[in-house]
């Protein structure tokens, strides 16, 4: 299968991505069909072993069977870390806030979340969670690498997701972006989508209380706590460098879990048929 697109992918492409015999073509600077023809012609000139190697690259993609949980309250800077430190990794971001903001804009509701729009906002929030859940299921079905972005207030939900992913052979990590309450409140005031102050305080307290539990859920060496109380300039330099080193070192390791290796073996056998 060859997916042809210019701007955005749909659910079909997301489902087949990294599956056997799937080639994805994003047409940057050309028409999709023409680019696809060039790829096909290039593959025709390869030997059987070279062709098999080309197909196997998807199975051994660095992000396969890797899951990174991102934790931190409103104003912690975790979204900036997601957009910057994970850029170019190919990992799939699971974040209900993205779907929520998109839904609010489509419904002409304010992203500053005023009290008078709470009823309609909650309806959109539920839809956003359903959409995110469907995306998560599709990504996991293909064993794609994940970035699960949340405040991580709900400890039991995080534990359930970790248990599920580990049962499928995933290697789970956490990046905890930590700030004090004063910094979180100030950054919340400066962000486009402000959260009511009482929610920032409540979320900050709950997330802080969960740090110890997170350290028990994620084994030593698989949790990074980032101090993000410093200036924006320091965030761009030292903080992102620390996060990038942690992420890249984990992505360089191939899956060692027996469940993951069994799944990869099965996928390779399907390719040989």
Report each predicted region and the residues it spans:
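Short hydrophobic/aromatic beta-strand immediately N-terminal to the Walker A/P-loop
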Residues: 67-69
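NTP-dependent small-molecule kinase module
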Residues: 3-51, 58, 214-273
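The conserved Walker
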Residues: 73-74
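Conserved phosphate-donor/acceptor-positioning beta-strand/loop module used by diverse small-molecule
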Residues: 166-187
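Phosphate-binding P-loop
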Residues: 58-65, 139-140
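Conserved lysine of the Walker
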Residues: 78
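Acidic, metal-coordinating catalytic cores used for nucleic-acid/nucleotide bond scission
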Residues: 149-158
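Conserved substrate/cofactor phosphate-moiety recognition/catalytic segment
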Residues: 82-144, 156
């Amino acid at each position: 299968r060859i997916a042809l697109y210019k701007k955005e992918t749909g659910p079909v492409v997301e489902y087949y991505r990294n599956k056997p015999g799937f080639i994805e073509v994003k047409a940057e600077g050309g028409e999709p069909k023409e680019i696809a023809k060039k790829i096909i012609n290039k593959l025709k000139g390869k030997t059987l072993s070279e062709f098999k190697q080309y197909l196997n690259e998807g199975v051994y993609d660095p992000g396969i069977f890797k899951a990174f949980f991102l934790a931190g309250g409103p104003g912690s800077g975790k979204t900036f870390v997601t957009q910057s430190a994970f850029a170019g990794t190919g990992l799939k971001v699971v974040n209900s806030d993205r779907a929520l903001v998109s839904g609010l804009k489509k419904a002409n509701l304010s992203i500053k979340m005023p009290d008078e729009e709470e009823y309609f906002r909650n309806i959109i929030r539920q839809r956003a969670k359903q959409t995110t859940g469907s995306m998560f299921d599709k990504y996991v079905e293909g064993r794609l690498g994940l970035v699960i972005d949340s405040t991580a207030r709900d400890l039991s939900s995080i534990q359930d997701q970790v248990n599920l992913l580990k049962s499928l052979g995933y290697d789970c990590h956490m990046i905890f972006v930590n700030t004090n309450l004063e910094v979180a409140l100030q950054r919340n005031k400066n962000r486009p989508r402000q959260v009511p102050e009482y929610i920032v305080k409540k979320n900050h307290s709950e997330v802080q209380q969960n740090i110890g539990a997170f350290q028990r859920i994620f084994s030593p060496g698989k949790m990074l706590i980032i101090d993000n109380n410093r200036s924006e300039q320091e965030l761009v330099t030292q903080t992102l460098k620390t996060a990038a080193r942690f992420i890249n070192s984990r992505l360089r390791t191939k899956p060692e879990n027996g469940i993951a290796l069994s799944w990869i073996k099965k996928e390779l056998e399907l390719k040989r048929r």
